[in-house]
Amino acid sequence: MNDYIVVKCGGSMLEQLNDVFFDCIKKLQQQYKVVIVHGGGPEIDAKLKDCNINVEKRDGLRVTPKEVMDVVQMVLCGSTNKKFVMNLQKHNLLAVGCSGCDGKLLQVQPVSEEIGYVGEVSYVETALLKGLINMNYIPVIAPIGIHDNEIYNINADTAAAGIAAALSAKELILITDVDGILHEGKLVKKTDESEIATLIEKGVITGGMIPKVQAALASLKMGVQKISIVNRTKDFTEDTGECIGTTVTRGVSIV
């Protein structure tokens, strides 16, 4: 059991996860070393609204001035992370919640001054993750990081990709509410960068699936060998521990 698997759950998924998801994590843990990264968008938006702070996004990234970063940190590292950890442990999965600040786990480079405290992963302190896993814990990571002793928000997909690349993970699994990429009603089991561009251009990939495949492509560029897009409501593992959904790799045809 030497290979790593990184699982990313978006914030909109966390309240909807059922027993099937947790059973799948148990299966994966029997075969691999598992790390989970989560988002928290809906809960952050709700808390910002409560605080009368406007929500603004540019190119899919949350504009994060200091007052927004304070809320992001409070939600991601607090209620969202701890509720997810407790849910995992309720299903007999031993988990430890961490943020990217803990142990300098995630170091970042700022994206741009215009969007404030938003960073991209530049370094991952993998020893912390490996230590937790060696003690039989599942690390559950809230995607914030540090730069020059300041705290930055990180897109959860970007954080998961950075962690997967740093661990030389066998696979990055993106949890969604659909079976994967669908073409004429049928599941696309395998695809690659060039075919994804074609499918987007033809309108096969639309709406909420576009950010998922863009995250997959970004992960490939960072060195992750395989990305799976799977449905949270179905058993997305085979008996072997392999994922069932859409697999994105380099140079693989969907035909």
UniProtKB/Swiss-Prot annotation:
Keyword entries, A-Z: Amino-acid biosynthesis, Arginine biosynthesis, ATP-binding, Cytoplasm, Kinase, Nucleotide-binding, Transferase
Record GO biological process: arginine biosynthetic process via ornithine; L-arginine biosynthetic process
Site feature Transition state stabilizer, where: 8, 212
Database matches in Pfam families: AA_kinase
An example Gene Ontology molecular-function term: ATP binding
Subcellular location per the Swiss-Prot or TrEMBL entry: Cytoplasm
One cellular-component annotation, GO: cytoplasm
EC annotation from Swiss-Prot or TrEMBL: 2.7.2.8
Record field: catalytic activity: N-acetyl-L-glutamate + ATP = N-acetyl-L-glutamyl 5-phosphate + ADP
Pathway: Amino-acid biosynthesis; L-arginine biosynthesis; N(2)-acetyl-L-ornithine from L-glutamate: step 2/4
Positions that bind substrate: 40-41, 62, 153
Family of this protein: Belongs to the acetylglutamate kinase family. ArgB subfamily.
Function field: Catalyzes the ATP-dependent phosphorylation of N-acetyl-L-glutamate.
Entries under NCBIfam families matching the protein: argB
Protein's name in the database: Acetylglutamate kinase
Organism classification: Bacteria, Bacillati, Bacillota, Bacilli, Bacillales
Name of the gene this protein is made from: argB
